[in-house]
Each structure stands twice: as structure tokens, then as C-alpha cells.
Amino acid sequence: MKRNITTALLITICSTMLGQSSFVPKSWTTSTDENGTVYRQSDGLTLYKHTKSSDHFDVYYGTGYGKTAPDKLSSSNALYVNVTDLLNKAESFYDLYVNKLKFADLSIKSKLNQYKMIICLLHDTGWTATGSGYDNTIGALWVTPSTCHPVGQTIAHEIGHSFQYQVYCDLGGYTGFRQSVGNGSTFWEQTAQWQSVQAYPDLMISQSIGLWQYNHNYAFTHEWQRYQSYWLHYYWAEKYGIDAIGRIWRGGTVSGEDPCQVYMRVFGVSVKDFFKEIYDYASRMVTYDMDAIRSYGKGSIGKYTYNYVDTGDGKLQVAYSSCPQSTGFNVIPLEVPSAGTEIQTVFTALPGGTTLAANDPAQYNNGEKYTTANVTKYNNFSEKTRRGFRHGYVALLKDGTRVYQSADTVYAKGHSTSAVNDTTTFVVPENTERLWFVVSPAPSVYIVHKWDENITNDDQWPYQLEFKNTDITGHVPYVDLSDTSIKPSDVTFDIYVGFAATTGNDYTGTTYNLTTAQLAAIGKALRIQPADIGKLMKTYSANQAKNTINLVPLNPKTNAVVNSGSTANGYGHWFSKTGNVCSWGNDSYVYSELDAGTLTFTIGQYPNHCKNGEVYQLGQGFRYKDNDGNVATAKLIFHIYIGGIPAGIEEQAYPHPLPQGKGAMFNLQGQRIGTLQKGLNIIEGKKVWAK
């Protein structure tokens, strides 16, 4: 017995000292040439036996390198690779994926204890990067030199695939997501991206945001966002630990399960609780409010596209292109009313397969662009009878605090053949900077999304919204223009903005988006649909054409139109210290430029001219000339506070005259007044400045 123990100990020590051995795939045949051993794959790829290795990787060079190894070439040569750096980085990824993310468990029978992973460095000036493995035994990757200039996130991604492949090599069964769900398994790409940005977290946003902002309403596992939709990985990792994703990859025991099904089984989560988590995840993703991503997501807060249709009866209906799938969600930006205001949302769940709203272009994003679906209804699918929704509010305060409000309620469940509505309320907190309404489906059954490149058979959960005391940011309302006897008329708005003085070459200031109420008032006054304002904009002309809008400057004393073309970029003007339109130069202090596509004003300054504490005024107007030659102007008077708007002055813009029912107005002595007076007024308990 003593002799046997000694022998076993000796074998263990020798194995440890020898380390992992090189693995030669079955598909490789061996020969030699003047430069040494040559391996030839069945597909014709030829490689030289490795000349450099590390603890866990062997590197094989394409035979095109001949006698000159890739790291012996000039660094300016396109085929040059710093192989030492490649191996060092590969070892760091190995350590991350094994010891932190737990894609392999070396304490059990793992083939990583026996063999080194394989890197095939191809002799090719093109771009190739693929990760997988050989013979269900060991992970491998195939890369060209261009992917190693420098070695970084691309190699981390492909070695991630190598470890995904390794899961099944070590555990077999239904682990490793080898079975396709439809035409493939999107979880491979999602996870490889997530793995790679664990090594390069500063890339997590740039690798995702371009498409994620358009397609987040799609299923988590949708093929058209498979490289961008790795954010649920972060939610699971925060909830269960950084090794949660590795546990999901290693946890498959049932044929054909997708990652969400494996997740629910591994962590004991019911379907109902799963969709409760999806809503919580969606709410946090509005502001990237998870520990691992919060600091990186600051610049992308709220950057989600939401397409909808104004039905003309006060309701807004989700467009086909934004209709959420069961593991997708919608982020709906809202205008921020005064603190303490109670806002209401009437949410109406529509039946699956409902006819699209009039004017819905019926488009979808295919991962590259928006294209037409050629449908007149939302998708019809068998699980539509299992309807349910979760929804609520997210507020971001000025100090960065997030406020979440939602009831633990599944709305509209079980009513699959009719529209069902509910009303939720939210009191706007003090110091709210931004506000959103979040919607995510919560059906009573989990729906597997299959990769098939066909939008029309995906599940969709349509609905309508109606708001009180707020509206969707940038909502361009529909106005009733049926009474053709009403002629265009002037309307005036006072708008208050603030920003700090600048020096050097800094011309920045702030931006201002016209509110829904302002757009509606402009449309009613000028007798045009607000959605047409940008379309009707034309370059200034003294002989303005009919059915066009010119952006014109205003006289600072009388608010009368000043006949002047643009003196700034595009539709824009520079203004002097006294508010008169001028050209760029020594007399210019502030400017305003309009983006006609978004109806956003960029308001800035001439550096070194403005001083903190000073107040400037500029006026611009949408001058509209209708088909009968009638002319009217919507006048915007911007009051610009350098250094910021003083506390106590209401930032909301009110039109002149105030809309009916806006509320009582008082002067600072508490006396009720009928019209706004110059200076400070009190409207609905708030101080408002009027010119």
C-alpha cells in the first residue's frame, strides 16, 4: 500500500511539472518540408508546428511564413505579429475565463488539464477571426495578423468562443449550447462580446449602443442584435455573481433549451418571476444602473429609440418597429413637469394581431437598417392569448439618484381578445432631471425566439398610451385644423435657458427642444400640423414663397420681425449684447441655430464675451405664409442666464396668451392679474419671468 501511494504521488508531481501537452487534431495530416513539420487540414489549410508556446496555448503559423516567423518580420509588414504579446494576452484571457468567469472547472475532469488550446495564425492580409475548437476536445481559434494589430478585444472575443466550445468538451450532454434554436444560437455571440468587454470594459458601450438603441424591443436572443444585446448578462451577474454566465453555459441538461430556459432552471426562477426580473432589468437599463456598467453608461443614459403613432384622439400607439417582444422592452422619455406634480399614464393593452395605427409605416430594423414589413397588422402568433404587461416610471435626479416606481402587478393578463386599460400615477420628485415610462411584456408562458430572419412570426405585444400632466419628449402632436375659416395668427413664447460663460474657443451653451404643448400651440396658431414645421422650412427670402416657413430674427424691443437671412450656421442667427441680430464678430454675444429635422435649438455664445451673472435675450420666429398669402409668426423669446437660471424662476416656457385653464396668475404682491406682467409673475405657485 505504501508503495502504491508513493507511485501515485510521483505520477501527480510529474504531470504537474510537465504541464499540458500539445493536441494534434484528427483532421491534421503530417508531412515535412525544408522548414520543418507541416500540418495540413482537410480543408487545405497548412500550418507549421508551433515555434512559440505559453502555459496554456500553442501557436501554429501558416506555411506562407516560410523560414521567417511572424514576429521576425518588420513591424511595418502587414503580416507581422508580436507573438509574445499575443500569448501574454491569451494567458490573461484564459485566467479571466477560468478563474473568474468559471467557463471551465479545472478541479474536475477538464481537458484543459491535459491539453493546450490552439491558436492558428494564418498567413493572410485579410481579416479573419474565428473561435471554436477541434474534435470536441480542445478550444481553438483561427486569426489573421490584422486582428492582432494590436491584440485586444477581437482576440478576447474569439478566445471566448474557444471556452464556450470547451464547455461541451468537458461536460458533454446538453451543455455549451451546441444545439441550434432555429438557424443558430445567438447566445454564442452575445456571450463572447460580454466576455471580451470584461477584459476591455471601456468598450462595452461602443460595441453595443449603435444597434442596441434601435432593437432593444426585440427578444433578448434575437438574431438582429446578437452582438449587442449582452446587457442581461450583467443583470444576471449582479444578481447571482460574476460566474453566473459560466453556470448557465455549464448548466444545460435538457435538449433544445435556450439560455433563458437554462437560466430559469439553474437558478430556480419561475416564469412569472423571470418576467418580473425582465422588467427590473429594463428599468435599470434606462440609466445603466448596475454596478459594473454605471460609470461607463453615463453618456448613454436614455438613448433608446421609441417609435409611435399619434392616433389623433389623445392616444399614442406603439409603432410596429418598436412593438416589444416578450424579453424586449420600451423606454419612453417623458417631459419633466414641476416637482410634486402627479402624472398619470393610461395604458391600454391591445390584442395580438391588432390592425396597425393609421400612418404606421410598418417598418422593422433588420440589424442594418429600417425596412418595410409589408403588413397591416401586428404579428399574429399562438401565444398571444397569454398576454400580460409590467410597466412603471424611472426618474433620474440631478444628483444621480434613481427613483423607481412600479407596482408588483401583471397588467392586462388573460384578456387576449379585447383592449384592456389601467391607470398608473407618479408624483415627480424634487430635483428630477429626466423621466421615463418603461414597458415590458409579461406573458404567462415563456416564448422561445427562433433565429429565422423573419420579423413577421415574432411575438409582439401592442399597446396605446395616454398621458396627463406630461407627454413623450419631442412628441409632435396632431391638431384639429378642420375649421378652415380660422386664419393664421401670431403666438409668442417666453423660454428660459442657462449655461456657464466660456473662454478660449468654446462656443457651447445648451440645447432646447420645443415641448408638445408649444408645438400644439404653434400648429393651432399657424394652422399647420406641427409635424410639418420642419418640412416647410426654407432658406430666408424677402419674397417668401407660399406654404413655407422662414426662421426670422425679432426686434428685441417690439418683437417685430426683422427681415434678415441667416447669420449663423444653417437656420440660425447671431445676436448682439442688446439682442439685435448681427453677424459673427466682435459685436456678437449669443446665437441660436435650429435643427429643422428635430426642432431642436442649439443656443451658444461667443467665448470671452458673456459674463456669469448676466442675462441676454434673443428672439426668433417661425414666419409662415399660407397658400392664400396670409402671414403669421410663432415668436420664441429666449431669455439666456449666463451662469445658470436663478433658483425660484420657473424654467417651463409659457405661451402668450396662456392657454385656457392654465391657472391663476399673481404678481409678487399676491394680487391676481389677468395677463403676464413684465418681470416675475407667480403662476400655479411658481415664479415665472415674462418679458
PLM features: residue spans?
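Zinc-dependent metallopeptidase catalytic helix centered on the HExxH motif
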Residues: 139-207
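A short beta-strand micro-motif common to beta-rich folds, especially ectodomain repeats
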Residues: 611-627
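Active-site-proximal alpha-helical
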Residues: 212-291
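C-terminal tail/sorting-segment detector
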Residues: 1-3, 680-691
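Residue-level detector of functionally pivotal "anchor" positions at catalytic/ligand-binding pockets or at interdomain
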Residues: 643-672
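Zn2+-dependent metallopeptidase catalytic core
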Residues: 20-57, 61-138, 145-159, 163-167, ...
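Terminal processing/anchoring signals of secreted or surface-associated proteins
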Residues: 1, 19, 648-651, 670, ...
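Beta/coil-rich, acidic/histidine-enriched accessory regions frequently appended to metallopeptidases
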Residues: 257-490, 496
